[in-house]
Amino acid sequence: VAQIVNGKSLKPRSGGAPKQIVLLLHGFGSSGADMIALAPEWQDTLPDALFLAPHAPQRCGIIGDGYQWWGLSGRSPSALAAGAASAAPAIDAFIDRKLNQYRLSESNLALVGFSQGTMMALHVGLRRPRAVAAVVGYSGILTDCTTLAHTDFAKPPVLLIHGTADPVVPVSALHRAESELKRLGVEVTTHVSHCLGHSVDPAGLRLGRDFITHELLRSTPGIR
């Protein structure tokens, strides 16, 4: 299993020990440095959260100095599902390590992804032994979930956000993911940003913040 050993992080604004972890998973050819930029916008409502934005284990040979969770050799549903499955063990091991380090559980963890990172957040979030508090996916795809249909799998609340003008991952991916998740019994909320390309806008940033704040505080009563 490839090991995640580096990346960017932002400690709790409160100065105390983390009471929640927000794991930020970047897109293809990007890095944790891009994703950690979301964290300052969310610290006001989650002052006790540790924000972690690891670099994917593989270097991306296509885009500059970026990283990839897996190489995008194909975009067929089977290729994407296989890629996500191959990358998941490194993320699961990283999560296990951090939860153990800070003596927290899945109920204290939110997963946030962008593009390929959304594929990973959804793949991992739906397959953890216990449900995480929340999954937020920006501009991504839900990889094949047929193997989950007849299993008693974790069903964390999911928020999907996408731009109508996304030239990389069409917004139709959001609608397909919403339909599939609902069919599987997952609580899913969606937001479409009109005229937005393959990026995150201020409205999406606010919605993501409010969603993970609500779910993290709901799943860890007594923390305010």
Predicted regions span which residues?
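C-terminal catalytic histidine-bearing segment of alpha/beta-hydrolase fold enzymes
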Residues: 175-224
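Short alpha-helix in the alpha/beta-hydrolase fold that links the catalytic acid
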Residues: 37-39, 170-180
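Short beta-strand/loop motif that positions the catalytic acidic residue
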Residues: 159-162, 166
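Primarily recognizes the serine-hydrolase "nucleophile elbow" in alpha/beta-hydrolase
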Residues: 99, 107-154
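Short N-terminal helix/helix-N-cap motif within the alpha/beta-hydrolase-1
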Residues: 32-33, 146, 201
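Alpha/beta-hydrolase-fold catalytic nucleophile elbow
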Residues: 54-55, 112, 136-139, 161, ...
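Short, proline-enriched alpha-helix->beta-strand connector loops that line the catalytic pocket
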Residues: 19-20, 106-107, 153-158, 184-187
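Serine-hydrolase catalytic machinery in alpha/beta-hydrolase-like enzymes
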Residues: 2-108
